[in-house]
């Protein structure tokens, strides 16, 4: 037994999609009772009998394993525990430990600092080929708050497994959820359409935890045992997938944890300045009699948007072309404009460009169409379709066949990247709204993908692979002057894309039911959930993807989206104040609100762009209130207000009929953005009036932010 080892170690890693991790100078001390790893003020201690780990910062415990059991693995349904440390060997940045197990054989546990604040722990069970799950248990005091994991408010059953894999709560949102996830179980298996996930959470105790890999897993956040946070993940066939690897990040502040996390998994992409203008789009630009724009017949819905913007004095921004605008099956069979729907595309795009619009278009890794020249036909002939039942390629929301691209196949990646690049190059379209990527993905253990992984490994990996293909297509044409916005995300996806929050409800039951304000409520929470996840730039379909039926919901959502990472206005049905689904149809009050806040978005663009530059280190544009002062416990779960950048405090309204609310001001001094004459001291609650055209916004005293 080695009981006296001291060493200095340096480790330099370059994870996929990440920059080089900074070297960690680590002092390792091994005694008969404890193994200590010291990286400046951060210390990892491993008790030897039985093995128990804890992480400390300046002598204060941030997190520790449960006393009655920490690391574990499962074989044939039986949970096996680790015992005493037999041997300790120095490795770069830390130690490798031989550990007894209750099977009588030896497991290997490696503990090492990747940076001065990132500790990696790896468990390799004995005979790993026979292991079906691995996990960890951590002590959770009752005052701990846990943030992150998903943007979705909570896990709920899907509507019809294998057919409509949508969470029931997404379609009919309940009034549940907040920032704090404590007391929940959260499954790590991406379900559409609120599909920003990561096996990563942050704790109010001052640490973060991220689990490596893409296999399915479960976080039990002190639900089964009020004193324990546990994680359990499946293993897979590859040797590297038959072990548990997780990283602990020492804060204590949330910004530091995000910096460490994104340094490991990949720095988030920051799009060009123009992407922070407001976006205009429709779920469908309808086929019909064209209208004239600059003397050329174009799609009438598009002409209506452009000409009404000019007539009403609404600033130009980003115009997005959603599916269907190209030809064939599902409106997406070939990268070729459907000129029945979209006549004179060159002239149309020139008219938009003259007015200052940038343009984006819909895409997904769906191989549609079985006719000559269709992408589905070509992909199938090349062997690029994902595993599963074979039939003629047919894209459909329900009942489609053979249409998912095998994004693990390098040939398929290159082929699709080049097709996308050719189209955006030809038409100068500088962005893609990347849909799906988590829907209808073959995800069974019997689904073997091109790279040898099973569907249970690929489902969570698909968003990143899909995003990288489209990122590379755009980058090959435009350098860094493009935007990619996606719906699904898992570890590393934000390195390639920014995000929007899925098919959010302005009305229930896929838009067939009654109107609701709970979709807006969920968007307010989801944006902040994403912020804790290392997803710094996020937006939502203003008014709801499923058509709003109450004008107040649209008004309040416009106000909220002005202070979101992305302000995008569109969805199913009409989202135009001059053509409302409510009365009056031509709604002057709504026109004034729409114009006021799209203009304000343009006014605030320099401030937003400056805040966005911090996103490269993981700092979100929208910052949940715990970011403001982690010592002020009134902020721990205050979800209905947030910081927008460093100096604006925003308190959105989501309830229909609400005309007043309270706002809690954190420490410091604050001024009303709308009436800056009065300075208010922080750590107090103020009551504010909120007429329909007003959202409460406060400015940090002394900050320089352009006024309304």
Name each model-derived stretch:
Residues 308, 351, 355-356, 472-480, ...:
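Carbohydrate-binding surfaces of carbohydrate-active enzymes
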Residues 18-20:
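Boundary at the C-terminal end of the N-terminal hydrophobic targeting segment
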Residues 41, 123, 200, 309, ...:
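Conserved, mostly hydrophobic/aromatic
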Residues 4-14:
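Bacterial N-terminal signal peptides
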Residues 150-153, 158, 163-169, 175-176, ...:
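Aromatic- and carboxylate-enriched substrate-binding clefts and catalytic-loop regions
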Residues 34-275, 279-300, 306-311, 689-707:
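Catalytic and substrate-binding clefts that recognize carbohydrates or anionic sugar/phosphate headgroups
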Residues 51, 128, 205-207, 214-216, ...:
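Short, glycine-/Ser/Thr-/acidic-enriched flexible segments
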